[in-house]
Structures are given as structure tokens and as C-alpha cells.
């Protein structure tokens, strides 16, 4: 959830409501939102990005909890004012860089990434294939798969897992089918221009090696609300 309102009992927008709200904004604008900045915790996950794919071109956010200081708005707004015609992808990459610089030397653990949602279908297709392969492998490789989960960075009471790190752990397993689909996902998660992950960075030992995008992967019970998401 995002946009908590302390004046109404802590009400907030969940992922389904966020999709509806932004679809309404797009209807008013007559086009997609160029860039959505989410200065909030845990927002750059695959399920959130999938919810927003029809409303937003580029999103910037963190896959972990953000410090209370949040974004360096003075620098970001100054950049936007100085370069009003800068395209969304370029500005998003700059925001990621500026955010990380603002926490350098402050003993904070942070992540930030920019996602081009026009490229999300390719990654979701790779996830679909990986999911099917994992299900088929559970009978023979449940313990190695569980070990790969445990060795991957997890966030929010272990409910979210870094997608890239998990794929890299799966790539080490003996099952050739799993290794192949994990390798394909790793390639799809490579950051750069024209890719889903335009840019990503992190500071802190706890997030070393993370790739800028998480996925919901709890260790036991799945939240019933998850089934109502587009993903």
C-alpha cells in the first residue's frame, strides 16, 4: 500500500486501488503518465509494476524500506526545471543516481531503480516459464529450491525476494531445466537502455548483489488479497 492518510485512520491505496486511480488520471490526461516516482517503501516489485503497466511509462522506486529522509527533492526538481524536455527514461536514471548519492556515507542501506514498463512483458514471460519449471521440479528438487530461497535477499518479514539474486541461486542447482530458465531470466533482468530495468543501484552489505526488482515469495501462507492482483 502507498499514500497513507493519517487523518482517516491510516487508510491507504492498495495495489488494486492504485491501478484504478492512475487509470483515471490517464483518462483525464488522454495519455499515459510519463514518470511515476514512488518515494515509499517496497514499491519496486514485479507485481506493482504489472499493475501499472497500462498507466505509466516509467517508474522509479525502491525494493526495500526507504529511510525517512526519502528523495533529494531539491536536486530532482532543480534538474527537472533546468531540463523540462528531458525524456522520462533519462530523468529516471538521473533520479536513481541522485538518490544514491544523497545517502553516500550516511550509514544507510538503500536501493533505487528505474523501470521501463513498456518492456515488462518479456520479463513476465520468463517468470511464467520459471514458475512452471519450479512447480515441475518440486517433487525431486524441493530442498535445493528452498535453499536457493533462503540464500537470496528477502524483505518485509521475508515476504518479498530479490528476483535477480533468486535466479542466480537457481542457476547453481543441478537440474538443467532450472538452470536454463534461470539464465534466461537473469539475461532479461540486465539493466540498461531499452530494457525493463533502466538503471539500478544500492548501498549496504544487506543488499549487495540485488538487482532492483523484487517479487512476492512468502515462505508459507499466501495473502488472499494477492489473488486479486492482475499478476
What are the roles of these predicted feature ranges?
Residues 1-231:
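Terminal, contiguous helix-loop blocks that mediate binding/assembly
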Amino acid at each position: 500500500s502507498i499514500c497513507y492518510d493519517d487523518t482517516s485512520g491510516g487508510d491507504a491505496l492498495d495495489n488494486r486501488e492504485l491501478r484504478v486511480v492512475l487509470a483515471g488520471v490517464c483518462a483525464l490526461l488522454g495519455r499515459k503518465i510519463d514518470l511515476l516516482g514512488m518515494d515509499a517503501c517496497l514499491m519496486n516489485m514485479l507485481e506493482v509494476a504489472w499493475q501499472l503497466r497500462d498507466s505509466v511509462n516509467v517508474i522509479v522506486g525502491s525494493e526495500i524500506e526507504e529511510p525517512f529522509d526519502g528523495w533529494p527533492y531539491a536536486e530532482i526538481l532543480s534538474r527537472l526545471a533546468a531540463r523540462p524536455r528531458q525524456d522520462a527514461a533519462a530523468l529516471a536514471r538521473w533520479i536513481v543516481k541522485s538518490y544514491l548519492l544523497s545517502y553516500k556515507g550516511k550509514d544507510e542501506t538503500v536501493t533505487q531503480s528505474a523501470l521501463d514498463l513498456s518492456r515488462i512483458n518479456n520479463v513476465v514471460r520468463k517468470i511464467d516459464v520459471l514458475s512452471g519449471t519450479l512447480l515441475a521440479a518440486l517433487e525431486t528438487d524441493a530442498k535445493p529450491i528452498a535453499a536457493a530461497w533462503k540464500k537470496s535477499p528477502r524483505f518485509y518479514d521475508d515476504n518479498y525476494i530479490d528476483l535477480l539474486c533468486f535466479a542466480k541461486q537457481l542457476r547453481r542447482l543441478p537440474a538443467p531445466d532450472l538452470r536454463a530458465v534461470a539464465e534466461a531470466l537473469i539475461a532479461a533482468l540486465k539493466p540498461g537502455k531499452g530494457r525493463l530495468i533502466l538503471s539500478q543501484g544500492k548501498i549496504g552489505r544487506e543488499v549487495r548483489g540485488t538487482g532492483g526488482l523484487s517479487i512476492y515469495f512468502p515462505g508459507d501462507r499466501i495473502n488472499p488479497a494477492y489473488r486479486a492482483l492482475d499478476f
